[in-house]
Amino acid sequence: MAQQQQQQHQQQQHHQQQQQLLLQQQQQLLQYNNNLYNLNYNMEDNERRKRREREKYERQQGIQSDDRETSLFGEPRRLNPSEGDAEITAALGEFIDARDHMNSSTVGIYRHASTNASSSRLPALSFGGSSLANSYSTSSASVNPAASLASSSASVPGQLPTSQQQQQQQQQQQHYQQQQRAPTYLKQADNKPPYNGRGGYPGQPMKNDIPSSSGMAPPRGPPRSSSSASQSNSNSNSINSSSATNNATSGATSASMSSPLGPPLSTQMPNGREKSFLGPPAPALPNGGRFVPPAASSKRPSNSVGLQPPPPEKDISKIITEMTNNYRVTPLTSIAATPHAPMSENYNLNGPNKFKYAFDSIGPLNSPPAAGASSLMTPLLAPIAPITSPIAPLLTTPPQASQLPLPLAPLAGATTVPPALGGMAAVAPIQQLMPTPPKASPTPPAIKPMKTEKNHSLEKQDSCLENDLELSESDDERKKEGRSAGNSSNSSESDSSESGSEASSKGDTQQQQQQQQQQQQQQLLLQQQQQQQLLLQQQQQRLAASANGSKKKYSQTIIASGANTISGLLTSSGLGGAGAGSVAGGAGGAGGAINATNNTCGGGGGSSGSCMGTMSSSSSSNKTPSPTDSNRWNLSRFFPKPANQTAAESVSPGVANAIGNVSMKVPGILPGGAQIIPESIDVTTAIVKNEKLHDEPRHVGDDEDDEADEQHRQQQQQQQQQQQQQQQQQRYGLSVTVKKEQLEQQQQQQLLLQQQQQLTTEQLALAGALPKNQIKRESRLSDSGSASSGSGSGSSSSDSAGGSSEVLQMPGPGETLQIPGVPAAITTVLRVPQAMQHKVQPNSVTLTPIGPLPASPKPRQKKPRKKKMSAATAPLDSSDEDEPTASSNKKHALELAATAAAAAAAVAVPVAAAAAPAIKKGRGRPRKQAQQQQQQQQQQLQQSGNLSSASASSSQAKGPTLTAAKKPLAKASVSNSNSTAPATVAAGTRKREHSSNSSSNSNTPTKKPTATFATMAAKLDRADALSSDDDSSSSSSCSSTKSSSSSGSDSETPAAAAAGAAASTATTVVTTSAQNPAKKRIVKINKVGVAGNSSSSSKAKRRYSVGSSSNSSSSSETEEQQQHKQQQLLLLQQQQQKQQLQHQQQLQQQQQQQQSLLGQFAAESLPQSAQRLSSSDCSSSSNSDSSSNSSGSSSSSDEDGEHRSGKRKSDKKKICTLTRIFNPKEGGAKKQGQVVIIDQSEEQQQQQQQQQQQAKELKPRATPTQLLGATLASPARTTTPHLTSLMCKIDLSKLARQHHHQPERLKAQQNGHLSSRSAEGARTPKDLQQICTPNGYVGGAAGGGAAASKLLGGVKHEHGVKPEPELEPGYEGKYKLNSVKQEFMLKQELPARRRKRSSSSSSSPYKEKKRKKEKAEQLSKELLPVPVLLPANNHERLSRDKLELLMQQQESAANGSPNKLQQQQQQSRLSQSQQQQQQQQQQQSLSQSTTAAATVAAAPIQLPTTCSEAVQTTPPPAAPQPEPRLIYRSHFDKEEENENDDLRKNDFLLQEAIRRKRAADSERDSFSQMTLYLEAIVYFLLTADAMERCNMEATWTMYKDTLSLIKYISSKNRPYQLSTNGNHESHNIVAILSLRCQSLISLKLYKLRRVNCRAIIASCTEFFRSGRGDILNGNTPSSISPSNSVGSQGSGSNTPPGKIVPQDIHNMLCKQNEYLTYVNSAHELWDQADRLVRNGNHIDFIRKLDHENGPLTLHSTMHEVFRYVQAGLKTLRDAVSYPQSQ
């Protein structure tokens, strides 16, 4: 006994000595901290204030000083943290952790360690080397009486430590330390929070309820001593952790206890903020307190058990083992960086991989590690287990943990659950967190401080934004917390940190307790679910492995490890087959797969699985942030998890990785929430930034590779889809799968069916993530390519994202969200019923939605040129997709669309072989071997299932839009009703269109006729099908945004033509167009000969049938319309044939080539509009368009020479229009003079045509090259004699847009929005007298399409005409009923080229054409240099041409026969001029009515009678026609568009806005950041606009906060505006758009308060009028003694004369000033923007943007602002990302 007592006494003495050493060390540390604080906080108030202000300003400006960062923040942080930073912090963290671990373990402080473990580790304390660790242990002990086991025991040698003794000891230590502190810092604890509670003095307790601020300025006051903290908060580690975080020691303990992942307590400010001191606290806490040494808890248990002799040195070996295990387990891998990537930064979706390592959800930490969570992790678990169990309770209390706004359930749950689950269970999740051992070793609550830390740095910057917007991310956090405990910690923490985890710090203890309970429950669930998920994931991983095994070598392999969630995300992202296997796990990944989403496709579900580009071109699919982007997974937070999804599911992504050995090469989320993002994944990275790069090499370099990839993808997709269907049928796979070149039609159909089955709300929800991914890409690249394929599934993923039922209720599976002003990815193609797609014949091309957000850079378009050579499908994609790397994107898009379209158009696939899309190498150049290539490509298309999927993917790139229903360009034979040769040509043209469109913001592919080897009949059929398809697509999209959808269909028309699938595909297009939001560009369906093999009748039928049947609804109408139109067409064709047989053959040759393109486009535009129209509308449009359609069909059917001649008349008008449009002098065709009009006297032309008609053989249409060559050879009068139709390469996008909008069906569809600028419309043949629109705008929409195709014969394609800004589909209908043509005409400054436009604009019906014939020479001579001056205003640019077009349509409907037209043309010049004037007047009236009706009457533009006159470089003699009369479009015309708002979209829009803002917060590139911010702004505006119908006050708040946000953003952009770097112009344009937005927001704020302002003005007016109020004279005392009067002086004696204003009046005046200030600001900001446009020489850019999207005025709605800004940003991204391809 005596010996035992002696031993005990010795032990006690030893402990006392150790404690004394620890106290000394603590004192030293405190003194050191005090010195640091003295440096930082002992400054004078003024100095501190100045410094805080300066730092705040710097943070706002994105300026960061390293020294200041180091002193202010736990780790240097950037607004856009870099991966390098993450690595550095991770490396430091590990080192610190190791050091801390060694110190603490040597000291023997294991707070949670069992008594045995602690006792075993106590001997380490005996070593002097562990002084630091001892100091930590003492501080920790002092902080928490429960935790101060070791310290108290050591302090009382002879007694077992009691909480009182411990407290006393702690108090003594604190006093001792405080005495040593400099008196300057010492402030007696008066229970008053210093600095209003912002900071605490060392001895001063902190208010625990003070929310941790984002830390704009470091808290004031010296760091609290650990002893003082322990005294004041001896019982609550949470309070101390927040208040005493400044003390390295106390902070260390509290941090270790409260939150292992939290920032070092020393770095935390007394008020709970993170001071982020890296230096001095580090010695105390190796990680600056962020990571509690795992050994810290060992000492505690020994104390609790009782004083025991220090364990033998063998514990040191244990410590070393633990060190090795822990730190080996958490190397500086992506996981290791986690501690530095706290949840708070998770919201930075675009943030660099710095956050890769951040644990997506803390909750998962508690969840048992996924199978093989990491073999490395496991060793940590054993040592950690003891730690975690004790820590868990502590974690609940520490304010740091509470600081995490998220319910710590996931965080604390990790530690808390361990007690419930057992130390090991808890440990396992921690181990997963352990990737940074410091995090793991401390309890997960430390994670909160971690997040808060990041939150501070990011949040300091975000706080301005998010707080200004009052996004109430805390609400988001709550919602997220509700979703699943596992994910809640992840999302809520990041959100809370984002929202500025200030409020979250309140009630931390309660939250922690609740969280612990939740965590325990969640952990149990997680364990169960993880076990299940491990099985599923293993299976899925196998599937993913197979999928990855396929040639899909891009991120698929990476994603494969992601197992369920990743594969599911990939599938949902539309990576269809390739990613399907990997996606299988997490189809609904939005919820549980959120983490997986992070891994898979950056940003919640990789949205559209773009992350790995599982689609044929993974790179393109990776438009969405690649998994390498650590922040990508953060997007998942925004996606509501499936209700059934448990927290375990959230862990599942990590589990997938955990299942096997943790592979750092495979993206995944460990159970702890740590995300493994392989940085080495080039595919993902490349995909993110240069999708086209990956795709292009494949497309350009290796068609075989593409095919092989496609085959692999197809196989993978099939397998994956099957698996997914089995696992999750609801998972939406993209309706479009990977290219299925080799897949059979049945396989395609099956895939489509599977995909459709998979199209579910979850899929849509996942798609919601797609915009996020696209956002990141959009910042750097136009998202066109990767977004399209990435969205390939494209459109479905982003569409589903836009329309995901979870995120946003979708109008229908095939419908678009149809946000009135939103061209963005709001439509969901995924939901398109397969039946619809199957109904659409495979020849049809799906719509390419106009993605408002992603702007495919034009450079990519150039790249598509290369790719175009490699594959025909690529060209289609490029045109569809709006990205410069169209070809790469094209492949993906084609693959995606091919997948969906292959199934839908399985029947068409065989047909597709018949026609091969003519591929154009250059943007404007057709391939010389277009026909052969087309044939080959068509065959390839059959194999690869090339659909207009490219357009679909491109639409996604442009924004979530419908993708297609595009069907593989299956063109069995030209003769077949499904003859698709023209379609393939259309595909080629579509590429061109895409390239040009990509240049323009909307995806309005420049439609360029490509020579089609197909026969005339096929061309005619195609033209009809195309026109009908375009109409249908435009009409369907018109529902949301008629004009945009119309132009979208127009833009896609080439793709449809390229698809050139059977006319029946029009239904698909219609469906897709319906799906497409109005804003989105619809890919025109190339309906080749659906209705009739006979060229004329079947053409008419097809056109009408396609137009009407493009949608199931229009199918019934199509029959009637087809019959009616066929009759009209027959009549018109007969007349035209009689009259224009002469013009036929040459025109036929050229037109056959061009008609295959333009005709298809025109036809497509017609059917699309018809689709939109109700059956009655369709029938009426067909009736009105009957003449135009007949002419169009005749033109489209090259077989009908008569029809051609008839159309040629209209073609003359169109040629005139086109000539003006395309004459470089007139500014047409980008002022490149790309349109060559053959201008011969009509008589000569007629003679030639007669001769040709005599030789009436249908000559194969010249290849685009031939046409171009002919045109180039003789621009004025090359080949076609009478046909004045331009042989020009008219921007198909322009014409197609117009043509789409022109169909009379469009009248009803467009609601007065005439956006019928399509290549077809421009080329409307004479037969389409009604349709003939001078600018190629479809006068009669249906007829216009056919006429346009005829014009193509007459028009040579020199260079793809770049789509004019007006061509934007979204805006065309809206802004340009006929004005688009006018604008083009006006835009083309052809002073030399005889702006016959002016006459043409005045030209009403074909009477003008007669006049033109008579006046041809005179007019050509007189008007040679007559340039049509573009009015300064875009509205002014709407020229009389619109009216003329309307008149022409009406007249053509009335005067359907070409004979009448010719007669009218034969009328005397006087009569013609009179008629023109009258017609112009009529047209104006009509335009007013039709504008509302959205009918586009193609008024024959009085142009030089011959095309040559219009086209000639030297102005040919042109009869002076009445000067162009500007048509001013009323802004009331566009009001109809915005009536379609769906309140269901409010939440989706808000989520999109938040995603983009967070992505911008983490973006490092200034330009990308500004564009993302601006995108977020417009989404906020759409949200506010939608809210306006419900809650005016909330709307006011939203607008006001948005204004504050945009002002803040603009302030950050100012330094770049004046810079001279290459981005100078782009930054200036961003500033212009920002100023426009600010102006309109200010005006909106005034309008919202206009009623109040009126009342105030009335009251104030009454007050001043009545003279109420006492008048104060300077010398006369007033009845009321002035406040400033001096007693000695007479009252008022010193008061200046004035009037006393009552308080109520004063308040009203203040309010009035506020409201009127908004008005003043609106105009002032608008003027600033105008000045910046002029001074910066951005007039051309803005003018183009106005033309394409409609002018932005103070009358513009928020939807229009959205479209306009999105289009501008898209164009900017294209220019910045791909300047070379511009």
Swiss-Prot record:
Keywords: Developmental protein, DNA-binding, Nucleus, Pair-rule protein, Phosphoprotein, Transcription, Transcription regulation
Pro residues bias locations: 435-447
Biased composition, class Basic residues, residue ranges: 859-869
Compositionally biased tracts (Basic and acidic residues): 54-80, 450-463, 691-701
Spans annotated as Disordered: 42-84, 150-313, 434-515, 605-637, 691-732, 768-820, 839-891, 911-1064, 1091-1126, 1166-1234, 1296-1327, 1386-1420, 1450-1484, 1674-1701
DNA-binding region: 920-932
A Gene Ontology molecular function term of the record: DNA binding
Phosphothreonine: modified positions: T443
InterPro entries recorded: AF4/FMR2, AF4/FMR2_CHD, HMGI/Y_DNA-bd_CS
Disulphide bridges: none
Compartments, record wording: Nucleus
Record field: compositional bias (Low complexity): 164-180, 211-260, 484-515, 609-622, 714-730, 782-805, 929-972, 996-1018, 1033-1064, 1105-1116, 1174-1196, 1461-1484, 1674-1694
GO cellular component: nucleus; super elongation complex
Pfam families: AFF4_CHD (PF18876)
Main subcellular location of this protein, as a coarse class: nucleus
Gene Ontology BP, a term: regulation of cytoskeleton organization
Modified sites of kind Phosphoserine: S472, S474, S878, S879, S949, S951, S1457
Bias (Polar residues): 623-634, 973-982, 1308-1318, 1450-1460
Protein task: Has a role in transcriptional regulation. Acts in parallel with the Ras/MAPK and the PI3K/PKB pathways in the control of cell identity and cellular growth. Essential for regulation of the cytoskeleton and cell growth but not for cell proliferation or growth rate. Required specifically for the microtubule-based basal transport of lipid droplets. Plays a partially redundant function downstream of Raf in cell fate specification in the developing eye. Pair-rule protein that regulates embryonic cellularization, gastrulation and segmentation.
Family the UniProt entry places it in: Belongs to the AF4 family.
Name of protein: AF4/FMR2 family member lilli
Species of provenance: Drosophila mojavensis
Gene, per the UniProt record: lilli
